[in-house]
From Swiss-Prot:
Disulfide linkage: none
A Pfam short name: Mito_carr
Name of the featured protein: Mitochondrial substrate carrier family protein J
GO terms for cellular component: mitochondrial inner membrane
Localization per Swiss-Prot or TrEMBL: Mitochondrion inner membrane
Domain of life: Eukaryota
Protein family according to the UniProt entry: Belongs to the mitochondrial carrier (TC 2.A.29) family.
Membrane topology summary: Multi-pass membrane protein
Solcar-type repeats, residues: 30-118, 129-217, 255-342
Mitochondrial matrix side: 53-88, 151-191, 279-316
Amino acid sequence: MSSSHTIQETKEVHTKTNKRIQWDDLDPKRYYFYNFLLGGSIDLLMFPLDVIRTRLQVQGSQNVIQSFPQYNGTFDGFKKLIRLEGKRALYKGFLTSECGYLCSRAIYFGSYEFVKQGFLKGRSDSDSDLLFVTTISGAISEALASVIWVPFDVATQSVQIQGSLSKPKYKGGSDVFKKIYGERGIKGLYKGFGATIIRNVPYSGIWWGTYEISKSKLTQFNIRQKLGLKERSSHSLAVSAEIDKNNPSHEVENEDPIIHFISGFFAAVFATSITNPLDVAKTRLQTGVFPENEKPNFYTIIKSTIRKEGIRALWKGLVPSLLTSTPYSMISIFLYEEVKKLSLK
């Protein structure tokens, strides 16, 4: 990090005299470069769990052509997939997913920081204001990113559910785009868009609200001291005015990475558990094959699932979802907060 970002060494007790890092404090070029690098690296590690999650969520649905054997849980799914389809199958749809994810990620995080900064202006530092602003900002950023993400999500999941028990319909992600567009037009690529919004927007709002409140509470609780960890020597970071003359030099809070890590865990567990039924319905709606005279929607999918499989079916895939979202959330938010520090002007 350059000298303009030098951490101000101090042994003083942390206070709220330094503001949090905001959008105006960041250099966009560095911010987006580090975000792309970060997102791709984490996805490479976590994608296999996403394949298993998708298959678990669609198995048992009468509207999805199942070409893989019945999985009796996450680990059984891994065992059968590798044995029958090989290790490469763990990354089915990865390139398609990554193209959409990296583009939507840029919109998602950038819009979150920008919208949050706008909403926080003129508001107090109270937890209630923080919860409201971050929840709304998270929801808005997800809605914007979903416009880019949904077609790639449809293509990715269509490839992920193709097993070894029948001839695959699609050769890959690009083939999915070509065939779906040819058969159903742009509407086919946005199949389940409403369901995605209904699932992802609440998830994002709940996640960010939980995360930011957890950060605030853990800071007040002095979690580092409670865990018996060494006191940090630096509590502020310098922002230079060299890049943006309209944003004078000032200091921002150097937040504790331990707090980011723990808050990411709380946010993932809470948001994933609450919205899993919405995720099951979204996946089935996007990957299902329905009669021409049948026009399924979010409500009918959930109603049909409960009637035919019981209410517990709405939590299918929760374990792999938690195994994916929790470490992903903890690691990605920890690194994302560090990216913000590296991207200071």
